[in-house]
Design a protein with these regions (language model features):
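Glycine-rich phosphate/pyrophosphate-binding loop and the adjoining helix
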Residues: 138-185
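Cofactor-binding loop segments of dinucleotide-utilizing enzymes, especially the Rossmann-like FAD-
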Residues: 8, 37, 131-132, 165
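Short gly/ser/thr-rich secondary-structure transition/capping motifs
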Residues: 62-66, 108-113
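N-terminal beta1-alpha1-beta2 submodule of the flavodoxin-like/Rossmannoid cofactor-binding fold
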Residues: 1-85, 90-101, 181-185
Length: 185
C-alpha cells in the first residue's frame, strides 16, 4: 500500500508531530511518501501571479510535467493519505493551504463531466487528518470541515478519520494522556 503523508507539523517539540509519529506506526512496512512542508526547497510555493499564470496554462493544456504538480500527482496515486497539521487560528496553517491548492488540480486529482459534475481521479479511499490544539477546537471546526468537504466533493474519499488532541495548553493538562486518548479514541 502506498501512503502519502502531508506533514505541516514542523515546530520543534510539535505535539502534532508526536501524534503523527504514533499514527504512522500503523503503516510500518508500507511504502511511505512524505511532503514535508517545513522543507523550503520541496514545499509547494503559493500560487502568486506569475506561478498562477504558469499553473493555469499547464492545466489548460493538460501538461502536468512541472514539479509544481508533484503534490497533486502523489495525492492521486496514493492508496491512503495522512495529513498532520496544528490547529491554527480556527483553521489550517497557510503553507498547508498552499499545498492543498496545488493538490486540487483539475485533470490530476479530480475532473468535471460535461454536465459540470465533479468526479475523482484519486485512488485513495481513506484519509486521516491529525491535529492538536492548545485550547479546545470548536464544534464548527473550519480546519477539519475544509478537509472533509474536499474529500467528499472532489476526491470521493468517504473514509475520513479525524484524530485530534485538544486542551494541551490548559493548566495541569496531562499531555501524554491526551495524546494517547486522541490516538486510541
Amino acid at each position: 500500500m502506498k501512503v502519502l503523508v502531508i506533514n505541516a507539523a514542523f515546530r520543534d517539540g510539535s505535539r502534532t508531530a508526536e501524534l503523527l509519529r504514533r499514527v504512522m506506526k500503523e503503516y510500518d512496512g508500507h511504502e511511505i511518501h512524505e511532503i514535508k512542508l517545513s522543507d523550503r526547497h520541496s514545499a509547494p510555493q503559493p500560487l502568486d501571479g506569475d506561478l498562477l499564470r504558469l499553473y493555469n496554462a499547464a492545466v489548460g493544456s493538460r501538461d502536468f510535467s512541472s514539479p509544481m504538480f508533484a503534490p497533486a500527482s502523489m495525492f492521486a496515486a496514493a492508496d491512503e493519505i495522512v495529513i498532520a497539521a496544528p490547529f491554527w487560528n480556527f483553521s489550517i496553517p497557510a503553507i498547508l493551504h498552499d499545498c492543498i491548492e496545488l493538490i486540487c488540480t483539475q485533470g490530476v486529482t479530480f475532473d468535471m463531466s460535461p454536465e459540470g459534475e465533479y468526479f475523482s481521479l484519486c485512488r485513495a479511499k481513506r484519509l486521516t487528518y491529525i491535529t492538536t490544539a492548545g485550547g479546545y477546537i470548536p464544534e464548527n471546526d473550519h480546519a477539519f470541515g475544509y478537509i472533509r468537504d474536499l474529500c467528499e466533493s472532489f476526491w470521493c474519499i468517504k473514509d475520513i478519520r479525524y484524530i485530534k488532541a485538544e486542551g494541551l495548553d490548559i493548566y495541569g493538562a496531562d499531555i501524554e494522556r491526551l495524546l494517547d486518548e486522541a490516538y486510541h479514541g
